[in-house]
A protein has these predicted regions:
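Short, Lys/Arg-enriched segments at the junction into DNA-binding effector domains
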Residues: 7, 118-179, 183
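Positively charged, aromatic-enriched patches within helix-turn-helix-type DNA-binding elements
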Residues: 151-221, 225-228
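Basic, amphipathic DNA-recognition helix from helix-turn-helix-like DNA-binding domains
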Residues: 61-63, 69, 73, 78-139
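Active-site beta3 strand of CheY-like receiver
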Residues: 49-54, 59
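Charged docking surfaces used in two-component/phosphorelay signaling
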Residues: 16-27
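Short hydrophobic/Thr-rich beta-strand motif most characteristic of the beta2 strand and flanking loop
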Residues: 29-37, 44
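His-Asp phosphorelay/catalytic-motif detector in bacterial-type signaling
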Residues: 49-51, 74-79, 195
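Conserved acidic carboxylate
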Residues: 12, 36, 59
Length: 235
């Protein structure tokens, strides 16, 4: 949710970084705590006290990927992963196991604050829709998306999507049969302008495509239109 004072937990073994980020985010209106190992981080993230977690990959006692895997068994707490710059594999794995976004180190604290707010706005949207019965269900080609309950069924079977994947699918289903530009998806879902060096949108789409699976004839439901965007195909 997005409140006047969102509570953030930083899980990173770099105490100096935790202190610097905490100071900046506090000025930006967040309430920030930090822990310095994976086991303590998982316990904090599962405590129900926080609105979001900032999670480093390299941690003592339990690495960030294992923290996230265990967290996702019990919680949908939004998570931004801190990854090594240039390490695409860390980013891919993080998004595959349920991170909402990633930010490579070193990063600009202003960018981190912007990412936090964007994700918290999505979470706030989830809650407001969950209390409303006015948002219409979208049903296309065996895929049924219900905004009010945040449930997606594929041929009658529920699939588990992150908040980003859900919003991407909603955008594509709403324009089924039409190409949706990458720039538009980035601005409407990720809430930032598309960067030539930011592959997070591609990774989210790839994960969404895997979760949706192929049709009975083996064709993909979502296709990439090179250098333009994506299309939810119709049969």
């Amino acid at each position: 949710m997005l409140t006047d004072m969102n509570k953030i937990i930083i899980i990173d073994d770099d105490e100096e970084l935790c202190e610097l980020v905490s100071e900046y985010l506090t000025v930006e209106g967040f309430e920030v705590s930090s822990v310095n190992d994976g086991e303590s981080g998982l316990a904090a993230a599962l405590s129900g006290e926080y609105d979001m977690a900032i999670l480093d990959v390299m941690l003592p006692k339990m690495n960030g990927f294992d923290v996230l895997r265990n967290l996702r068994l019990e919680s949908k707490l939004p998570v931004i992963m801190l990854t090594a710059r240039g390490d695409d594999m860390e980013r891919i794995v993080g998004l595959e196991i349920g991170a909402d976004d990633y930010l490579p180190k070193p990063f600009n604290p202003r960018e981190l604050a912007a990412r936090l707010r964007a994700i918290l706005r999505r979470a706030a949207g989830d809650e407001s829709e969950g209390s409303s019965d006015t948002t219409e269900k979208i049903s296309v080609d065996g895929v049924e998306l219900t905004p009010a309950s945040r449930v997606v069924l594929v041929d009658g079977v529920e699939i588990n999507l992150t908040s980003v994947e859900f919003e991407l699918l909603r955008a594509l289903l709403s324009e089924a049969g039409k190409v949706v530009r990458k720039e538009d998806l980035s601005e409407s879902v990720l809430e930032r302008k598309l960067s030539a060096f930011d592959r997070s949108l591609d990774m989210h789409i790839s994960n969404l495509r895997k979760k949706l699976g192929t049709r009975s004839d083996g064709s993909d439901r979502i296709k990439t239109i090179r250098s333009v965007g994506y299309i939810y195909t119709l049969v």
